[in-house]
Amino acid sequence: MMIKEEAEGILKQRNSKLEELLHLAADPLLTDISSHKSRVSEFLNDNDITKEKTFVVSSLPGVSGSGSFAEAMSQSVSKSIYKVEEAKERTENAAIEQGLKRRTESISDDRKLKISRKSSSQLSDSRSGSISKSTSEITKPVAPPVKSQKENIHLETKDFLNRDIGELEILSVPEHYPTKPPNVSSLAELYYLTQTLPLIKLLPGSHKTLITENYELALLEGKIAVLYSRIEELKRQGKWSLRQPKRYYDPYIYTKSNNGKKTFHGDSLLEEGKWMAADFKEGSKYKKACCVTMAQAVNDYWTYGKVMCIRRKRIWHIGERREEEEIHGDLETDLVDGADSMAIDDINVDNDCAPLEITGNELQNIVVSDDKVSTEPISNDEPQRKEEDDIDSAEVADQEVSEDPSQDKPVDELIPEEEVELSSIDVKLLLSRPKPEDEIVPTNLPTFSEDDLKEMGRDSKDSAPFKLHANLNDLKKIDQSIIKNLPKFTAFDNEDSNMPAPALKPVDSPMIAVSRLLHPFEEDDEWYKIVLKEGDSHKSKSNVSSGPPEYQKGLFGFQSHRRFNYLKPPKPPLIKNIEFRSPTIWLPQDDKHLIHYVAEFCFNWDLISEHLSPSAATLRKYESNIERRTPWQCFERYIQLNEKFQFSDMKGIYSYQAQSWLEHAHRAQSTTKRRISPLGVGNESIQRGHRRLRWASLFDAMRKSMKKREDAIAKLNHRRTPVDYSANNTNVNSPEASNNGTPGPNNGKRPMDRVPTPAELSKLKFERDKSIQEAYLNQQATRSRMIAAVAQQQKQQQNNQGNIPRPPSQGPGPNVGVPPPQRGQIGVQGGPTNTPTGSLGNQVPPSQQPSQAAQGGMTKRPTTPNGTAYTAEQIQQLLQIQKQRRLMQQQNQPGKTGISPSQPNTPALMQNMPLSSNKTTVGGSNMPLSGMPNSTQQVSLSQQGQKQQLGPSQRQQVPVSQPSQGQGSSTGVPANKSRIHFAPAQVSAIINSIQTKNPNLTKEQVTKLAATYLANIQQQQQNRANQQQQQPPSQHSGAIGQGPAAHRPGQSQSPSNQKKPQVATLTPQERNQLQMLKAAKTAQQQQLQHQQQQQQQQQQQQQQQQQRRPGSPMVPNAPLDPNNMAKLEYEQRKNLLIQKHQQQQRLGNNSNIPGQSTPNLASMPPSSSSSPSSSVSGPASNLPNSNKNVPKK
């Protein structure tokens, strides 16, 4: 029982081993074991040991009877591996049929499959009875075969050579041409790689040997990243040009930094110049050496004879018979150097022996014949004499003519030169033609042989002092090869085959290097290589089967820049011009080019437009509307051709504008009969003989230009606003307007309409400076004339008034002959005589200030010493500080009040003024007064006495009236009548007004009329002063204390004459200033009332002080003089008008005067010296057109 069980166990083990052998033989890689179960039982039955059947190896699948089991296993393994490729091909074919378009097929794979099929067929034939066919079909391959690189190259080469020659393209290309083009990647791809996987980060962690090139490549990637980012930045800014010009290298800098690696045109010129200089220098040396050699040859010929001549071989012509002896003799003559000269003469070789050098006789003949030398080949067939070797060819011709017997003369007739006396010269002999053989007797040549020369140490072959030729053997081998390879020219060769290429072609530039004239060292034209290239059919198959399809090639596949670009419209034109557009005509070839360029340049419309334009943009020529190809017109035509276009396809910054433009164009086309959109026509639709309707577009362009001019004129006439009209009307009678003939500074055109060119600005500045200079000269002339006329009238009036004492004056000037009150008025009204007219805002009489405000407009606001403008709060604080200071001055000095004109302005006070007053600002202008005459300094100093009270020095207002001597008035003012003195600006304004109204009058007549008018004004003022003197003093004092309601007959209130400010047009800052000024006025009124209450007490205290000072010119207990009262009223009115004038300047009712200076805060009027509603009285208020005729600068 135990034995039976052991036998069954052994049998089972045997069967399991046999089953394993079966699986290994059928499927060595054991891919699918379950498929072989049906064959196991059959195999075990065939090898059942119970039936006395022994195991046979050949029964295994794949094992033949003659082979071993190991060979069968190796064949089975290779078979299963090749089946992998076969299965892969099957799956790829199935994928292509399903639409995936994936197929990889190569020649090597086909050969492998053929081999596997052969082996499988052999295996199936060997064991057809034992193993079924399903076993080989069920096996599934797993891995490709593992082969070395050498084996793969060998298989590919063998497959390439076994391919049919019809599938290949045979190319013959020069040897130095590259066979395969280099791989090129786009900048975007390189930038992406540098940002994702930069080499500079991968190199430190690499596990291979690194060399310098790896790090240089990493640095190059960094440079590419910087370059790409910079290009993208320039593209966003619109600064990246479509065409990149060649970089310019400065010759000096580039050569200095790069050691002359790059040559320029200038360098080529220098090199050619150096070469030519060397060539000329060596050429002159060569000529000198030739001359020396020739002279030496002549000397040797006459010294040693014919032995120094070169032997020449006789020339045998066609038809002549040459005997062998003569030929042999000639050869001996040429080859043997030691031939005898007499033998040479016997064979008539001496006729052939002629020296190559120029003999002495020939030199004489050359001189005689005026350097006319002609060389002729010497022929041996003509008999010649021995002397002909020394005769010039021209003389030989003359000798042949003279051999005529009729012209020959006997030799006896010739008289020797020795017998001819100087006193008797035969003219016939001079006129007769001489014979050289008679006159020139050649000397006998010496006869030397070669042996004689050798004995003397001379050689006939090497007699030249210099070497004038180059021997080929003396050169180097490279130079010899160059000379030997130079092309040779023969007369009867084929020109096309043997003639070398021309050194210079007509299309080449004239500057050619010297080496260009030589034959090239490397003859590339002779060496070509044969390149076998795959045909188009195989290339299409390989493209289909190489890798995934186009849409699966990743981010940087083939033409990836075209796949991921979206439609970016250019900037559209203005929508308002849609109705006036003319359509563009597009021919079929234009559409074809447009589609091609759109695909080529990826919706870069500017570049597409450049390529579609008929000519370059730099060529200025007329281009009709229908021929233009702007970026927008190209885009419009493209979307017209694209039937699938939608607004959602547009991306970019102009997408919204382009969509709105297209919508407006569609609506305009539906309402307009004329076509607006582009028109595509065929070649047959274009009219004949018109150049694309260019004539029609010419008329259209002319019509548009005419319409544009008419529209411009209409806009110019209707664009003027009421503010411009008012400004122009204000400036109509200005001096500049009257001189230039223009309606005003605006000329009916706003500044924002047109920007003047630099030439126009320069012209305007020149005209303005010229008009200012003329106006200044006219003012000076008029002022001098008016001062003389006024001085003359004053003298006449003083004579009529009687004995009126005149106080001493500070110096000569325009105040000479004018009483002290009038000097004070001049100091208040006139100001410095040399100040510009634009700075007279605070020196002009009150009635003239509104007119200047109308002309000058709003001045600049008060500024700090640094030039910055004060704010409204700072101005209010300064006004309060000034108010407090004036109150303190009135309390500390009760005898000197701000409104009392009775305080004298003594010369001592004028002298004690600071020296810096010579350069103080007058009316806001920084004009130094140091260079002015004494009269001008007095006037400016008298006015500055008024302005000192507003500064931070807390100075009291100093009246400008001069003290009188010997008068009984308590105020120190004489009892004469008050007079008025006009400023130069007022006089010039009056003259300009008269000249404008009467242009036909001359300057003298205008001056006389102005003088008469001023005299009338002064007379009226005097009459008013006389009426005021007759009134009792109580009325004057009452007039002073009337306050805001004061008004007298014959006077006009200034607020009624002034223009009310337009509050609606004020800025918030100006409104704050206006409120501040109103508050200051209220404070002034309150302060004025307080001052009027204290006036009586102040007068009493002043009288007491005058009594204590006996030397004082003031007389105590004297009532107020009427003149002083009138002056006090005048000061009040003046200060009020100054304040009003500054208010109007801040409100900005009028235009600015060019050149007017900024008033300082110190030039503001005193806030406590006037009433806002006080009346105005002055002779200047009656001037004609006084509000328009103040000249401006």
Swiss-Prot record:
<feature type="compositionally biased region" description="Low complexity">
    <location>
        <begin position="1163"/>
        <end position="1181"/>
    </location>
</feature>
<feature type="compositionally biased region" description="Basic and acidic residues">
    <location>
        <begin position="99"/>
        <end position="113"/>
    </location>
</feature>
<feature type="region of interest" description="Disordered">
    <location>
        <begin position="885"/>
        <end position="976"/>
    </location>
</feature>
<feature type="region of interest" description="Disordered">
    <location>
        <begin position="787"/>
        <end position="867"/>
    </location>
</feature>
<protein>
    <recommendedName>
        <fullName>Chromatin modification-related protein EAF1</fullName>
    </recommendedName>
</protein>
<feature type="compositionally biased region" description="Low complexity">
    <location>
        <begin position="1051"/>
        <end position="1062"/>
    </location>
</feature>
<dbReference type="GO" id="GO:0006325">
    <property type="term" value="P:chromatin organization"/>
</dbReference>
<keyword id="KW-0804">Transcription</keyword>
<dbReference type="GO" id="GO:0005634">
    <property type="term" value="C:nucleus"/>
</dbReference>
<feature type="region of interest" description="Disordered">
    <location>
        <begin position="92"/>
        <end position="147"/>
    </location>
</feature>
<keyword id="KW-0227">DNA damage</keyword>
<keyword id="KW-0539">Nucleus</keyword>
<feature type="region of interest" description="Disordered">
    <location>
        <begin position="1020"/>
        <end position="1193"/>
    </location>
</feature>
<feature type="compositionally biased region" description="Polar residues">
    <location>
        <begin position="831"/>
        <end position="844"/>
    </location>
</feature>
<feature type="compositionally biased region" description="Acidic residues">
    <location>
        <begin position="389"/>
        <end position="405"/>
    </location>
</feature>
<comment type="function">
    <text>Component of the NuA4 histone acetyltransferase complex which is involved in transcriptional activation of selected genes principally by acetylation of nucleosomal histone H4 and H2A. The NuA4 complex is also involved in DNA repair.</text>
</comment>
<feature type="compositionally biased region" description="Low complexity">
    <location>
        <begin position="845"/>
        <end position="855"/>
    </location>
</feature>
<feature type="domain" description="HSA">
    <location>
        <begin position="253"/>
        <end position="332"/>
    </location>
</feature>
<dbReference type="InterPro" id="IPR001005">
    <property type="entry name" value="SANT/Myb"/>
</dbReference>
<keyword id="KW-0805">Transcription regulation</keyword>
<keyword id="KW-0010">Activator</keyword>
<keyword id="KW-0234">DNA repair</keyword>
<dbReference type="GO" id="GO:0035267">
    <property type="term" value="C:NuA4 histone acetyltransferase complex"/>
</dbReference>
<dbReference type="InterPro" id="IPR014012">
    <property type="entry name" value="HSA_dom"/>
</dbReference>
<feature type="compositionally biased region" description="Polar residues">
    <location>
        <begin position="726"/>
        <end position="745"/>
    </location>
</feature>
<feature type="compositionally biased region" description="Low complexity">
    <location>
        <begin position="792"/>
        <end position="803"/>
    </location>
</feature>
<feature type="compositionally biased region" description="Polar residues">
    <location>
        <begin position="899"/>
        <end position="934"/>
    </location>
</feature>
<dbReference type="GO" id="GO:0003682">
    <property type="term" value="F:chromatin binding"/>
</dbReference>
<feature type="domain" description="Myb-like">
    <location>
        <begin position="586"/>
        <end position="642"/>
    </location>
</feature>
<comment type="subunit">
    <text>Component of the NuA4 histone acetyltransferase complex.</text>
</comment>
<feature type="compositionally biased region" description="Low complexity">
    <location>
        <begin position="1020"/>
        <end position="1035"/>
    </location>
</feature>
<feature type="region of interest" description="Disordered">
    <location>
        <begin position="716"/>
        <end position="756"/>
    </location>
</feature>
<feature type="compositionally biased region" description="Pro residues">
    <location>
        <begin position="805"/>
        <end position="822"/>
    </location>
</feature>
<feature type="compositionally biased region" description="Polar residues">
    <location>
        <begin position="1182"/>
        <end position="1193"/>
    </location>
</feature>
<feature type="compositionally biased region" description="Low complexity">
    <location>
        <begin position="935"/>
        <end position="974"/>
    </location>
</feature>
<feature type="compositionally biased region" description="Polar residues">
    <location>
        <begin position="1064"/>
        <end position="1075"/>
    </location>
</feature>
<dbReference type="GO" id="GO:0006281">
    <property type="term" value="P:DNA repair"/>
</dbReference>
<dbReference type="InterPro" id="IPR009057">
    <property type="entry name" value="Homeodomain-like_sf"/>
</dbReference>
<feature type="compositionally biased region" description="Low complexity">
    <location>
        <begin position="1084"/>
        <end position="1107"/>
    </location>
</feature>
<feature type="compositionally biased region" description="Low complexity">
    <location>
        <begin position="118"/>
        <end position="132"/>
    </location>
</feature>
<comment type="similarity">
    <text>Belongs to the EAF1 family.</text>
</comment>
<dbReference type="Pfam" id="PF07529">
    <property type="entry name" value="HSA"/>
</dbReference>
